[in-house]
Amino acid sequence: NLWQFGRVFVYPDVLCKGCYCGWGGRMDIYTYSRCCFVHDCCYGK
């Protein structure tokens, strides 16, 4: 929902390289494939 989406901008630690990360915002092997699933940058677009 919009409240949860807004939290992305409230807590910058959930951003990785300017993209939304759905799982804690950490850039590690476990979360990398799920990082930025809201944005096309995850898929090289």
Curated annotation (Swiss-Prot):
MF (Gene Ontology): metal ion binding; phospholipase A2 activity; toxin activity
Catalytic activity: a 1,2-diacyl-sn-glycero-3-phosphocholine + H2O = a 1-acyl-sn-glycero-3-phosphocholine + a fatty acid + H(+)
Tissue: Expressed by the venom gland.
Name of the top EC class for this enzyme: hydrolase
Disulfide links within the chain: C21-C36
Function in brief: PLA2 catalyzes the calcium-dependent hydrolysis of the 2-acyl groups in 3-sn-phosphoglycerides.
E.C. designation(s): 3.1.1.4
Record's subcellular location: Secreted
Keywords, alphabetical: Calcium, Disulfide bond, Hydrolase, Lipid degradation, Lipid metabolism, Metal-binding, Secreted, Toxin
Catalytic residues, chain numbering: H39
Protein name per UniProt: Phospholipase A2 3
Required cofactor names: Ca(2+)
GO CC, alphabetical: extracellular region
Entry keyword NAD: no
Residues that coordinate or bind Ca(2+): Y20, G24, G25, D40
Chief location: secreted
Family of this protein: Belongs to the phospholipase A2 family. Group II subfamily. D49 sub-subfamily.
